[in-house]
């Protein structure tokens, strides 16, 4: 029987629930959308009917695409761990896609309390493996709930805060049931049980926690109350990520979660994921992020999954040591085999004593062969990206003079009275929070946007190449990379010459002649980089070039940028790439641009200090660059 104290507590909650149910006008309070009766909803749906239909069609198209991918995927495996265990061990795991074998007779080991970084080359099947786990095509025990972040939230009239809170279906269901029972006159033990369960779920703190997560991902309080349909796809992806963090599943699968984040949000997410205590499987090509988050690394290579303890740097060190030992063992075995074969050939038909020794060595050789020989270490293919020589043009290449910019006449000012110049020796990384105008600045410099006030002067012969996140959308998906590049650059007549050009960007063999739609996202990015390089620009403006690229490709890109003769401005959430290629860090915020006095690692520490409310140590300039 419930105690008197529990009854009083329930009575208070019951009264509060009744108060919440009193008639209210259609507005928002504390981030929860409060709507008028069904008539208002129907009126709203009618007004937005066409938009809703378009969204539904796009959503269905994505679902159909996922179903086709799932139909083309075949997975086999056997659960080896105890059915009630919180760990998941799968043996004899094989994975094929469109008949191509991605994994063969390997094992998947995911242990509670571990945060795994899944790494491997572009197109090797990392995302496909996550999808197979998320769809439960891999025999994960049913009591382990899985949340796989696959795509952005579709546009809707809901707010980001509502979208995040509604993902916790158990809490939402319990709150609805509690409100219903609160209006019944009789005392109800069921109501007390509901309140006790809600307390276990920290239901009274749910909104605060959802708001904290959204804030960490860059949503201001005002943005948390805007309608989802007013946000871009990148921001809606952040909402989807916030839902994944809010629900706290037992197994969380994240595929490139930093792709749509700025450096501030990346630092926050890194700190947030460090506290994840269940099972996290993360695909990321940011070495810095993998180092900060992961306790283990899974290397997908040669159709196998190989496991390493520690973060990415520890994986590199351990793998190098293991491969050195493997090569020593390989050479020793090959020397032994050569020696025994030579002895057998020389003395196999000699005297009885020598013949017996030769027979003994032949048996030893047969045992070695039967037990399996050490394989030679096969290194990953080394990429060599290339930006052709651009020639010299005298400075100033681009001059920005008293430039101000706003998107609309009555809109907020993005920049105010900018004054700086860039030349062929410029190596700058633009950093700052989302919405500060980093991509906007690149568009102003290329001429895609015009200043509201002031002037941007460019050398008459300067050629600018801008890489941005939507460049893939310009690809003709029905053409192969070879056909697409031949179409874009008709001056290159020989297919073999074009094959060599594309090959430098890591697209070889069948990848060059397969339709672009069949390539992975990382491989499509390589097509875009090849296309951009052969534009032969003097200035490279790179807006998030690392999205979907593997670690080896990012390193090749860094080498190519460092060898490039022209100027470079970079927007990236990859701290390591910035450290490799940038000579200056420019911070975009508060309608201006200031030069950071240290390197990007010092800037990261500054962002970390902001998370805990500390004041940054460096003193920045307060004037334009």
Curated annotation (Swiss-Prot):
Task: Tell me which UniProt keywords the record has, alphabetically.
Answer: Acetylation, ATP-binding, Nucleotide-binding, Phosphoprotein, Repeat
Q: Which SMART domains match?
A: AAA
Please tell me the species this chain comes from.
Bos taurus (Bovine)
Q: Which residues does the record list as Phosphothreonine (modified residue)?
A: 220
Quote the Gene3D superfamilies the UniProt record gives. Answer: P-loop containing nucleotide triphosphate hydrolases
- Name the gene behind this protein: ABCF2
**Residue positions where N6-acetyllysine is found in the record:** 306
Q: Which CDD domains match?
A: ABCF_EF-3 (cd03221)
Know the name of this protein? ATP-binding cassette sub-family F member 2
Say which family it is in.
Belongs to the ABC transporter superfamily. ABCF family. EF3 subfamily.
């Amino acid at each position: 029987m419930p105690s008197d104290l529990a009854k009083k507590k329930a009575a208070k909650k019951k009264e509060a629930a009744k108060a919440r149910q009193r008639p209210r006008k259609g507005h928002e309070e504390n981030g929860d959308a409060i709507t008028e009766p069904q008539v208002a909803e129907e009126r709203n749906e009618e007004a937005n009917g066409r938009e809703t239909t378009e969204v539904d069609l796009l959503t269905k198209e994505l679902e159909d695409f996922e179903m086709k991918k799932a139909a083309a995927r075949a997975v086999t495996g056997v659960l080896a761990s105890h059915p009630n265990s919180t760990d998941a061990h799968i043996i004899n795991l094989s994975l094929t896609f469109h008949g191509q074998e991605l994994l063969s007779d390997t094992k998947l080991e995911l242990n509670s309390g571990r945060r795994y970084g899944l790494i491997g080359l572009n197109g090797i099947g990392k995302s496909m493996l996550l999808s197979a786990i998320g769809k439960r095509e891999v025999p994960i025990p049913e009591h382990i709930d899985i949340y796989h972040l696959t795509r952005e939230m579709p546009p809707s009239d809901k707010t980001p805060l509502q979208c995040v809170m509604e993902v916790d279906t158990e809490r939402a269901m319990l709150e609805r049931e509690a409100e219903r029972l609160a209006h019944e006159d009789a005392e109800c033990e069921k109501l007390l049980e509901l309140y006790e369960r809600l307390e276990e779920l920290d239901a009274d703190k749910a909104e605060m926690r959802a708001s904290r997560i959204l804030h960490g991902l860059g949503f201001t309080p005002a943005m948390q109350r805007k309608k989802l349909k007013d946000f871009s796809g990148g921001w809606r992806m952040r909402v989807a990520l916030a839902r994944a963090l809010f629900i706290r599943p037992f197994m969380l699968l994240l595929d490139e979660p930093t792709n749509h984040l700025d450096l501030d949000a990346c630092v926050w997410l890194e700190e947030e994921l460090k506290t994840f205590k269940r099972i996290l499987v993360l695909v990321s090509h940011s070495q810095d992020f993998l180092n900060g988050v992961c306790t283990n690394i899974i290397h997908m290579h040669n159709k196998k999954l190989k496991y390493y303890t520690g973060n990415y740097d520890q994986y590199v060190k351990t793998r190098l040591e293991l491969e050195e030992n493997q090569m020593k063992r390989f050479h020793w075995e090959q020397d032994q085999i050569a020696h025994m074969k030579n002895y057998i050939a020389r003395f196999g038909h000699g005297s009885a004593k020598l013949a017996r020794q030769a027979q003994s060595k032949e048996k030893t050789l047969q045992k070695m062969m039967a037990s399996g020989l050490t394989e030679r270490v096969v290194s990953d293919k080394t990429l060599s990206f290339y930006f052709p020589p651009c020639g010299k043009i005298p400075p100033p290449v681009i001059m920005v003079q008293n430039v101000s910019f706003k998107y609309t006449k009555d809109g907020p000012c993005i920049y105010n009275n900018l004054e700086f110049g860039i030349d062929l020796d410029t190596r700058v990384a633009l950093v700052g929070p989302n919405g500060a105008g980093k991509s906007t600045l690149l568009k102003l410099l290329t001429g895609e946007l015009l200043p509201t006030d002031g002037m941007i002067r460019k050398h008459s012969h300067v050629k600018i190449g801008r890489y941005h996140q939507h460049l893939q959308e310009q690809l003709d998906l029905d053409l192969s990379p070879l056909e697409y590049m031949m179409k874009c650059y008709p001056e290159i007549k020989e297919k073999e010459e074009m094959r060599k050009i594309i090959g430098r960007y890591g697209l070889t063999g069948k990848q060059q002649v397969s339709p672009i739609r069949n390539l992975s996202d990382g491989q499509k990015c390589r097509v875009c980089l090849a296309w951009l390089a052969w534009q032969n620009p003097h200035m490279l403006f790179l807006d998030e070039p690392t999205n979907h690229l593997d670690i080896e490709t990012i390193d090749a890109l860094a080498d190519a940028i460092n060898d490039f003769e022209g100027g470079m401005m970079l927007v990236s959430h990859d701290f390591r790439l910035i450290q490799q290629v940038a000579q200056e860090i420019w911070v975009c915020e508060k309608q201006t641009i200031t030069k950071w006095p240290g390197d990007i690692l010092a800037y990261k520490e500054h962002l970390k200090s902001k998370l805990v409310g500390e004041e940054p140590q460096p003193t920045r300039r307060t004037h334009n660059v």
